[in-house]
Every structure is written in structure tokens, then in C-alpha cells.
Swiss-Prot record:
Descriptive protein name: Probable alpha-L-glutamate ligase
Alphabetic keyword roster: ATP-binding, Ligase, Magnesium, Manganese, Metal-binding, Nucleotide-binding, Protein biosynthesis
Class of the enzyme per the UniProt entry, highest EC level: ligase
BP terms from Gene Ontology: protein modification process; SOS response; translation
Cofactors, names only: Mg(2+); Mn(2+)
Amino acid sequence: MKIAVLSRNSRLYSTRRLMEAAQSRGHQIRVVDPLRCYMNIATSNPEIHYKGQKLEAFDAVIPRIGASITFYGTAVLRQFEMLGTYPLNESQGISRSRDKLRSMQLLSREGVGMPATGFAHSPDDTDDLMQLVGGSPVVIKLLEGTQGIGVVLAETRKAASSVIQALRGLKAHFLVQEFIEEAGGADIRCLVVGGKVVAAMKRQGKEGEFRSNLHRGGSASLVRITPKERATAVKAAKVLGLNVCGVDILRANSGPVIMEVNSSPGLEGIETATGKDVAGMIIEFIERNRKPGKTGTKGRRG
């Protein structure tokens, strides 16, 4: 197969591992910077051009699109879909996962466990919003934040009101969620490939830090997940329409609750913690499932 990896940096661990896994199985693989792609949309024969030349045809495309380039990156991916290239994750699924509010609405509708979550516009509704999620302490989360950036723990109602007021002044959109204290600053990252959890790790925030992201100094270790946690991760991936994703789960007293679904999960932490060849599993999934033009969207739906 000829495989394209949409990535801005070929030296990143995840990109390198995917290339190694594909090449070891005899596939041709090329890293394509999505921001250097430009598209011919007006004709009946859609094209993608790259650094001054028409891009050759690929059998499959692996999107490793950073959150900061979601809009343009998914536009490029849609163009690949229109050309009949098999996408590991479709543009629609990535767009859903990157919209924290939309993804929470979809997960809630399908009965997936999640923390009490509120969203409001008017400052007059702040007190009621706090009550909706059970009162302080609360977690206030920017909709466009990643890797723990833009996430604040407000331990009192006064602190929460101050943070909310400041964010409204910046015209920022945010969610207010209940704080799952019993999680103890830890979460479970489940790596889903093709409707199965193929690896899982526990991420523990450093002392005094409620965020468990490895980018925030957290540590990772192998963990045994429960059948309910496994089912929750698989269902979340299915609801958002993702073949491959990282599902972040908190262990609440009420059971597993979803914090986030990452459509471009990093591989370094989970491969190191579990010793599993996740990159190889991803390439094997493409081998089993790739068919020309096999995409639910074909670029037609947003």
C-alpha cells in the first residue's frame, strides 16, 4: 500500500513509529504536511497539490492533525476522502472529537458516563450553572484547550465566579464540570483500535496537580481496566465515529466517566507504559479494512 501520514513533523515519536511499522510490513509511507497542501475544488476532478506538484494517489491516509490546525487539517482530509483515499479516522469524526461541547452532547445522548457538565452564555446564569453541576469545587475547561492547557480547578464558588467572569471578558467559550475528587488526580487512557481497547495506562498527576496529562509532568503506568471501563471506551469511540482514538476515563464513585476523546492520541506514553506495538496494530487495522473509496463521508458531510 501507499500510505500518507498527515503530520507537521516527521520527527515526532508517533509519526516515526507509524512509519517504521508500515515500512516493516512492506508498505510505502510518506509524511505530508497538511499546511503545505492546497486543493483544486472547483473542477469535477478534485486534486491535492503539495509544494508545487500534484500529489500522487494514496491507498490510505493517517491523519495526525494537531488541535491548532483542525479546521485546515480536516479540510485537507476531506479532499483525500473525495479522492477515494481510505482514512484511518474520517474528517467528520475528528471534527466531532475536537469540539468538546459537541462531543459531550453526543456522548450524553448515547448514555455514556460523564461528569455533570454545564454550558452557558449569560453572566446572570453563573450561580444556576454552578448548581447544575453540584456546586464547588468545579473544573472550568476552555473548549479549545489541549494537553491540560486552559483547565482550571476552582475550589470555591467565589473562585469559580472570578474565573468565569474573566473568561467571559475574553469572550472565551468554556465548560463547567463537577470535580471528581475520588479520582485522586489520575485518569485512565484507553487506546481504541477498530472497536477494541488494545492498550491502557494509568496517568497520575504530579503531587498537588489535579491534571494527569503527561505534558503537565504526569507519570504513566500499566493498568488493568474493568469490563465497564472497556465498554465505555469502545462506546465513546463508536459514538464519535473514530476507528482509532485515546479515551480518557476517570474512576468516579458512580463508575467510569469520560473526560475526553482524543482522535490523534500520542503513542509514546502508552507504548512505553504497556510495551505494546500500538503503531503496528494501527497499520494492521488499515490492512484489514482498507478498500478504495471506503469512507462514510466521502467529503459530502461536515
